[in-house]
Amino acid sequence: MMPVLKRMLLHTVNKPWGKYEDLYRTDEVVLKKITVDPKQRLSLQAHNHRAEFWVVTDGECLCEVGPNVWRLRKWGTIHIERGHAHRLINDTSEPCEITEFQFGLCQEDDITRYEDDYSRAEPPF
């Protein structure tokens, strides 16, 4: 029983755009609560080994996936296939909360950043 409890411990990571909290984590499934601060956005990024599913649980945000941008409000959802460039954008004056489900090979270093407001993007080749 102890290994399951360890996987379910809440872990908070502060980011320049807000924070995320690990709610559940295994090698193949991750459940996160993401809070995007007002007027902030995540990097434009892609993952080679995992897909993601987002549910807006509070506020609203823009979701950019490839060339498309959608406004999602509370309980709005979107699925991001592995390999697709994507990002969350909070263009409002209130925080936006997202529940993120990751599935596949879930590792934090499985990320390619194409654009980033905080100078974390990969240099062009």
Describe each PLM feature range:
Residues M1-P3, W17, V36-P38, T77-H79:
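Extended recognition/assembly regions associated with phosphoester-bond processing machinery
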Residues P3-K15, R87-F125:
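Double-stranded beta-helix
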Residues P67-A85:
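Short acidic-glycine-tyrosine-enriched beta hairpin
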Residues V29, H49-L62, G66:
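Glycine- and acidic-residue-biased ligand/ion/polar-headgroup-sensing regions
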Residues L9-A51:
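A short glycine-rich, His/Asp/Glu-containing loop-to-beta-strand
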Residues Q40, H49-R50, N68, H84-A85, ...:
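A generic "binding-loop/recognition-motif" signal
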Residues S43-Q45, W54, C63-E64, I80, ...:
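Short beta-strand His + acidic residue motifs that chelate non-heme Fe in jelly-roll/DSBH
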